[in-house]
């Protein structure tokens, strides 16, 4: 059976979790521009890739045919989100960001994590209803 019966006119861009992850991705992009040049191919690249993976996996999962495939991509998205938190911890430890800024990013992380877990639960229930 087709994965979700979603209306593809708005597609994944209508998902609240994707919208919040997009904001986070854009925030990470702005943040990494302030990192030292010595981090260009290290922390900067890792944080950019991980934050982009969060939204990309949600989008790719949305386009899959079966619920289980979508769930798996959402789990990958969740892993990338957690990777971002680790990279932000490194940025804190290296004093590229202060504790207040870290807590702001962590709050965004927690919001996305809750939305992502909710979306995974929704997809799991839909799969069981097939």
Residue ranges and their predicted role:
Residues 1-130:
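Amphipathic alpha-helical assembly/interaction segments
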């Amino acid at each position: 059976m087709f994965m979700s019966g979603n209306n593809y006119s708005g597609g994944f861009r209508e998902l609240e979790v994707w919208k919040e992850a997009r904001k986070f991705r854009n925030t990470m992009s702005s943040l990494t521009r302030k990192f030292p040049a010595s981090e260009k191919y290290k922390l900067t690249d890792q944080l950019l890739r991980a934050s982009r993976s969060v939204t990309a996996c949600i989008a790719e999962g949305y386009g899959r045919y079966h619920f289980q495939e979508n769930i798996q991509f959402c789990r990958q998205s969740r892993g990338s989100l957690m990777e971002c938190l680790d990279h932000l911890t490194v940025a804190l430890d290296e004093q590229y960001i202060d504790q207040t800024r870290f807590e702001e990013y962590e709050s965004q992380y927690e919001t996305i994590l809750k939305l992502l877990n909710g979306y995974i639960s929704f997809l799991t229930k839909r799969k069981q209803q097939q």
